[in-house]
């Protein structure tokens, strides 16, 4: 069975009972220091591009075709970055109001909200009279079903794969999103590392759904081998994803489906009334049996959630967290140094860097991501002051000065809510020389220059934030002051040269 959660004194969401006095000191210091705050809405970063996608991307080859259309491997003409472009042909949608079109738009709207290292990232999208065009990450490793069919999967490999799936599920479930069609074919491999680790991402959010606490869904969704019993009964919640995760782990290891039955109807009876077949699991460890048993609990009220599943012994025994987040002490010191130097960045630069980080290749930001995950002791995607203090002390092997830790934390907590999230951390810790190249600065300029006039105006900034709950008069005023200070021609606009100098000024601190 899973580990019992220790009943600790939780402070500001840290999950650690450290020094309460230190937390109070930080909060007082935080209140005494004023700074403009901007809460980033992913819908701002991921937006529709009003142009022809083939003006921005060069097609390398077609890598997939289906009834929906095709998937093309493409290269961004400005940056040289490799992407996948999903071209969905509108003529293949039987009816403009059909479920298929709704699924496409649903996937787009859901993916725009999510930013997680184990979920396929969407960068931008286009639409014309004939097609939808979704620009996403390109993952060269194929789907997990293909890998499982051709490669043996060890216990530790399966544990690390499921650990990553659970991290992603924990993230989307906290956002009130359920996937509803989790299966091997919808998990893609980004790479297989030398130590045998498969790095994965969940994709295909076409049937995903926003839910409310306490409400049960009625519409059946998913693939038959992976559907939870309560889904067949048309009364289910987000825990249907945990059931699917249990099926995935079972199939990865045994190469067999967990439920008997010669056809779908008979298999459905086993899922609802009899449960999974335990015999193929007898050769595996107690840790494997424990977590699969609790993920494939037929009573969803008793089934564990993702946060609980992450505490199971299997992930500690196989050291999954450290295997996935292998980052050296030298790298950590570099990231801490970057964070210290990030403190004077203003709201305009922060917005641009957030956009560039979102559009970076995973290799460019993997180090800070690993460091964040290493510090995130309770794996809730947020790190409070005490959790940060204790994590740094554990990593460095000695206590740092409280003033130094408070200063570092202040630079990370840009939203001033007494914790920092992954986006805030990566933005501060990333190597700015990788992010602020000429090509990428041009890309950021294009992001702000919505009318493609070659100039950025305050009206375009207001337009950018129009649908955001974070459109704050103080933030807009700060943007205006910055634009005015950069506008050497006094025409209320800034050009690429002015913007480039403005962004490269960040590098002077590194």
Question: Which functions belong to the PLM regions below?
Answer:
Residues 353-354, 382-398, 421-432, 457-470, ...:
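Amphipathic regulatory helices of Ca2+-sensor modules
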